[in-house]
Amino acid sequence: MRYTYVRQHDTTDCAAACLAMVCLHYKKEITITRLRDMMGTDLKGTNLTGMEKAAQELGFSTAAVRVDRENFLSEFTTPCIAQVITDEGLAHFVTVFKKTTIKDDGERRRHMLRQEEERKKCADEGKKFKCRDYVIIGDPAKELKKISLDEFYKNFTGVLLLMTPTSEFKAGKQKQGSMVKRFLDLLLPQKKLFFYAILSSVIMTVLGIASSMYNKILMDEILPYGLKSLLVAVILVFSIVSVTSALISMVRQWVLIYLSIKVDIPLMLGYFGHVFKLPMKFFATRKTGEITTRYSDASTIKSVFTSIALSVVMDIVMACATGVILFRMNATLFSISIFTTLLSILLVFIFKQPFKRINEETMQQSAILNSQMIESLRGIETVKCNAEEDRELEALEREYIKSLKISLRSSKISTVQSLISTLITTILGMVTSYVGIMQVLNGEMTLGGYMAFSTLSSYFTNPVSELVSLQMSIQQAQISIKRLTEIMDYESEQDETREYTEMEKIDGDIEFKDVSFRYGSRSPALSHVSFTIPYGKKVALVGSSGSGKSTITKLLLKYYEPESGTISVGGVDLDEYSNASVRRAIAYVPQNVELFSKTIYDNIRISRPEASLDEVKAAAKKADAHEFIRKLPLQYNTYLEEAGNGLSGGEKQRLALARAFLKDANLYILDESTSSLDFGTENTIFDMIYNQLADRSMLIVAHRLSTIRDCDLILVMDHGEIVERGTHEELLEKQGKYYELWSLQQGIFRDKKRGEKPAAPVSAAKVVEDEDDGESITY
């Protein structure tokens, strides 16, 4: 039986890859990227609820069950998905394709008892018990393998997701864009260069074949008859042929380099251009290393299609031309060359799967290693302040050693293939020499003819030998195409075929009406939230961390779409406006300020590229940033380091506020925008906000309640719901959640009953269980 194995692309893909295996078993082909979206995979992985939801959406009837060892041997539908714990202690999914099955309950119990007796007997005799029960699993992180039930149960948690296709399940192949077609579309505008490359290859082939006749003419025509006068002419002609061939080879190389550059620009920039158009959930559910390694995939594809593709064209032309000539020269020797070629092709097919597996492992491990390095460097301050350099280095070392081990296995496979290829070529080359020389000795062939055949035969066999040596690169390109295609097929955040209204300014009330939202398949982040931001009014969102405050800002910026409910601006559904125009109309200061490796001037005017230096200075003064900028050696022309390293948290926030003030929008969203500022600076900025921007709408997310006491409306959030609303004074009078938060910050909170102990905090484990509906987070 052939099992449908699918390897995961990235570290959090295991659930999607397992479901893809089950779908393939039932003749349905669907991409891992599509399945990730359906099951709500994020950086934490996928929970069982999300996977079950995706399976049901595809038309499967599902049942999540927990089984003990005896029940695992009972009859149930396979393939199914099992949850395991990896050796590193991470939750993981594998696909169970086949296993030992004992249908009768009584026989199953007797089987378990017999095994237990055998196990005890082996233990008493000091022997190792050999379990004959087996499981065939597809581990998306490793391979398809058959293992004993004992080995399986070392990692198995007992949780299975059983799946059976219903009448709603539809077999078939998901429509995918062709990366090959995309690449050919890039080559078509370069038809002229491509033609020159092929033409030069053909000319080189002809000249190469002509050069092979040199020895034949020398041995059969000149030496036997002592034609000294002809010798000079022949040497001169073939010297010209050799020089011409070398010059054309140089021109061909230049053409290939130029063609590579012409293809490189639209391919690489096209990839990042597409990535920039993807929705925020794409970035929120992937590590940076997983995205950047696709850039390497694009480079691999380019290399194969430009260099190798043209080499293949030349090799095919050369093999066909020389094949005809060789057959006419000596059919017997040609048959040996054909046999050599067929063995080399067979070798390619034999090593196809080993190379595929090792290439997939290499690319996945490369993404993991890149992500680990990026995270370590980004968090270098945290690493140093906790003196964790050695521990981080150990983590990097572990991943690097894994990469080296994969590389070593890859080298071993390549070496074995190369050795076999060399043996085939050498042994059959010696056979060809023996047969050819015997024919020369028997007078069936001239010495010059044999030498010409030997030279020409290399033109016939070399293309296949080249194919063998390039097999690793070609299969890398195939895997790269698959990985890159899944990204390129990912839908842009906005339908480019639809016409949207362009938002000029926000000049009306903003209304959230019964809005609910969740990230992936997690518990709801917002539940039936309704409120209005009247035009020109200041509205604040307060509440504990994770209560849904920042989620509201992300929905308003159209980073995500509500699961249900509507958001409107001036009575018009927000969905009617283009994403870009909405974001241009809003001045947003996020919690985490991102600064770029540009001048301070360029960093501030990113919100309004056409802004003059005077306008940038005015915005900086509003944000109380002008003074610290003025003290820098180059002031506004000071070039910032990556991510603004070298600036304090408060200085970064002031630059972010300057960006927002420069935009001069009608709606400002301040998400913890002054949390790193001292009280004096914070009060100065908020005085400016309440006075100079009194006519602008504002949504302020704050933990420091003293900054929002003058807001027109304060919304108190808890677990994704608005639990209180009103002005500062009204909420204090209610003595509810807001009063509690205010009292805590003012340092006057006391238990209502003297001597009563504060309530014990909910355990972290309980919180995680509540958030994930009791399901395990899996990677």
Annotate each language-model stretch with its function.
Residues 1-210, 224, 228-233, 252, ...:
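Membrane-integrated ABC transporters
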Residues 117, 123, 497, 503-779:
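ABC-type nucleotide-binding domain
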Residues 194-248, 255, 327-332, 434, ...:
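Transmembrane helix-loop-helix hairpins at lipid-water interfaces of multipass membrane proteins
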Residues 198, 202-213, 243-250, 301-304, ...:
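Hydrophobic alpha-helical transmembrane bundles that constitute the permease/transmembrane domains
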Residues 215-216, 256, 276-321, 378, ...:
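Juxtamembrane loop-to-helix connectors within ABC transporter transmembrane domains
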Residues 236-245, 249, 311-361, 431-445, ...:
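Transmembrane helices of ABC transporter permease
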Residues 273-290, 361-409, 481, 499-501, ...:
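Loop segments that connect adjacent transmembrane helices in multi-pass transporters
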Residues 365, 369, 381-388, 412, ...:
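Cytosolic ends of transmembrane helices, especially the final helix of ABC transmembrane type-1 domains
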